């Protein structure tokens, strides 16, 4: 039996609708709108697309969005000074610095400079630490979106063996913490992992976030597994994931498509986090 599709497109619409509804409620009470500052350094085409989609979502939902498109020559100190100003701005609840940054700018230093209460990307060590301590506040958008997708399957996550392919700070590592919090037994694989196939084959829940097209053959998937494909790769003009979708969907019980799976959830959770930050500041 073919896998059931987990649609991020549909779920993200519901989440955005709920966020917009809450914002309208606050506005009707005479309160200000939530504010999000979006900073883009340089003119990377992919980053421009992502930033554009975030700004459009803000407009749709009633979030006040302030844009800062900085030239590639911007120095690290100039960026840190801007972030400090935004940290002090009472109209701004969330600060988003689009990654990757130019090589000469230390992204870790930049992330650490954002006030933890305005870190709507959920990357600040304080917020990652809270998740690690099982008291999360602002959580990384993609892993949080994946947890929302997993909820829609109705599968009890307690005791499930979750395998994560990729150990990035943006997806893999916070994803491991989210799944631990949900009661899973978690394995994280990375570039030094030996016998990747055997790890994949043991996964009740498989999260793949590598950024390499079709790196996971469908035949590796365990019968009945839930497959979450975070990868977005362009091959011959088409967007494809990190998993061989056609084969994997014959073995999995649930699977996310690419596009229309995890991607829309990342932006939806950014809007959700911005509302959360606004509520904490109010």
UniProtKB/Swiss-Prot annotation:
Q: Which organism is it from?
A: Histophilus somni (strain 2336)
Q: Which family does it belong to?
A: Belongs to the tetrahydrofolate dehydrogenase/cyclohydrolase family.
Name the Enzyme Commission number(s) assigned to this protein. Answer: 1.5.1.5, 3.5.4.9
Q: Does the keyword Hydrolase apply?
A: yes
> What InterPro entries does UniProt report for this protein, alphabetically?
Aminoacid_DH-like_N_sf, NAD(P)-bd_dom_sf, THF_DH/CycHdrlase, THF_DH/CycHdrlase_cat_dom, THF_DH/CycHdrlase_CS, THF_DH/CycHdrlase_NAD-bd_dom
- Oligomer status and interactors: Homodimer.
Q: Which UniProt keywords apply?
A: Amino-acid biosynthesis, Histidine biosynthesis, Hydrolase, Methionine biosynthesis, Multifunctional enzyme, NADP, One-carbon metabolism, Oxidoreductase, Purine biosynthesis
**Pfam families associated with the record:** THF_DHG_CYH, THF_DHG_CYH_C
**Which GO terms fall under biological process for this protein?**
L-histidine biosynthetic process; methionine biosynthetic process; purine nucleotide biosynthetic process; tetrahydrofolate interconversion
Its name, as the record gives it, is Bifunctional protein FolD
Could you give a GO molecular-function term held by this entry? methylenetetrahydrofolate dehydrogenase (NADP+) activity
Function, as annotated, reads: Catalyzes the oxidation of 5,10-methylenetetrahydrofolate to 5,10-methenyltetrahydrofolate and then the hydrolysis of 5,10-methenyltetrahydrofolate to 10-formyltetrahydrofolate.
Pathway(s): One-carbon metabolism; tetrahydrofolate interconversion
Q: Please write the reaction equations for the catalytic activity of this protein.
A: (6R)-5,10-methylene-5,6,7,8-tetrahydrofolate + NADP(+) = (6R)-5,10-methenyltetrahydrofolate + NADPH; (6R)-5,10-methenyltetrahydrofolate + H2O = (6R)-10-formyltetrahydrofolate + H(+)
> Where, in this chain's numbering, is NADP(+) bound?
166-168, 232
């Amino acid at each position: 039996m073919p896998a059931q599709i987990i649609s991020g497109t549909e779920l993200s619409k519901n989440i955005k609708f709920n966020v917009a509804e809450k914002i309208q409620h606050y506005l009707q009470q005479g309160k200000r709108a939530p504010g999000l500052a979006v900073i883009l350094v340089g003119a990377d085409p992919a980053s421009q697309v992502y930033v554009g989609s975030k700004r459009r979502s803000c407009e749709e939902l009633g979030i006040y969005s302030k844009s800062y498109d900085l030239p590639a020559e911007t120095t690290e100190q100039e960026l840190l000074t801007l972030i400090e100003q935004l940290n002090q701005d009472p109209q701004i609840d969330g600060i988003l610095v689009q990654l990757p940054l130019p090589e000469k700018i230390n992204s870790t230093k930049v992330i650490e400079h954002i006030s933890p209460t305005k870190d709507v990307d959920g990357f600040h060590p304080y917020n990652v630490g809270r998740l690690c301590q099982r008291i999360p506040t602002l959580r990384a958008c993609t892993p949080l979106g994946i947890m929302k997708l997993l909820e829609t399957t109705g599968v009890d996550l307690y005791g499930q063996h979750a395998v994560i392919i990729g150990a990035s700070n943006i997806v893999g590592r916070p994803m491991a913490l989210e799944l631990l919090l949900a009661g899973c037994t978690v394995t994280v694989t990375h570039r030094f992992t030996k016998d990747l196939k055997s790890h994949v084959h043991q996964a009740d829940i498989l999260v793949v976030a590598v950024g390499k097209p079709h790196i996971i053959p469908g035949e590796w998937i365990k019968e009945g597994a839930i497959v979450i494909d975070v990868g977005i790769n362009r091959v011959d003009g088409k967007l494809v994931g990190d998993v061989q979708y056609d084969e994997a969907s014959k073995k999995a019980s649930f699977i996310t498509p690419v596009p229309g799976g995890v991607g829309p959830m990342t932006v939806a959770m950014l809007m959700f986090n911005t509302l959360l930050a606004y509520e904490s500041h109010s």
